[in-house]
Design a protein with these regions (language model features):
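Short hydrophobic/Thr-rich beta-strand motif most characteristic of the beta2 strand and flanking loop
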Residues: 24-31, 39
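C-terminal output helix
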Residues: 103-113
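Conserved acidic carboxylate
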Residues: 7
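The feature encodes the CheY-like receiver
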Residues: 55, 83, 101-102
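Short amphipathic alpha-helix used as the core "switch/output" element in two-component signaling
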Residues: 60-71
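Acidic catalytic/metal-coordinating carboxylates
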Residues: 32, 58-61
Length: 119
């Protein structure tokens, strides 16, 4: 399974990338919103793990742009911002699901598998 990880925090990104690779996933890591849109448009992914707060474009703008590109890849937003308004705006931008930070890695794996199975 190929994952696009979009995370600007180097420590969080490195932790997630290493854990996902150990689970057998192929991981491409984008460090900002522009890089995320570029990678999403250039390759096929099974799921996109998308941080909300990013340099250059926030996660909502990234999700909306990915959808404008015609990508139907499931998007899981990883964020501490999970108010009802944030969730509503995310859904409107094309986000499939939210996961609040902090989270347990095993819970992330469960959510990844559930979203990919739905597709």
């Amino acid at each position: 399974m190929r994952i696009l990880l979009v995370e600007d925090d180097r420590k969080v990104g490195a932790f997630l990338e290493e854990g996902l690779r150990q689970e057998g996933f192929l991981v491409d890591w984008a460090h900002d919103g522009d890089e995320a849109v570029e990678l999403a448009g250039a390759a096929a992914y099974d799921i996109i793990l998308l941080d909300f707060m990013l340099p250059k474009r926030n996660g909502l703008h990234v999700a909306a742009e990915i959808r404008r590109l015609g990508q139907e890849t499931p998007i899981l937003m990883l964020t501490a911002r999970d108010s009802a308004d944030d969730v509503r705006r995310g859904r409107a931008a094309g986000v499939n699901d939210y996961m609040g930070k902090p989270f347990k890695f095993d819970d992330l794996l469960d959510r990844i598998h559930a979203l990919v199975r739905q597709e």
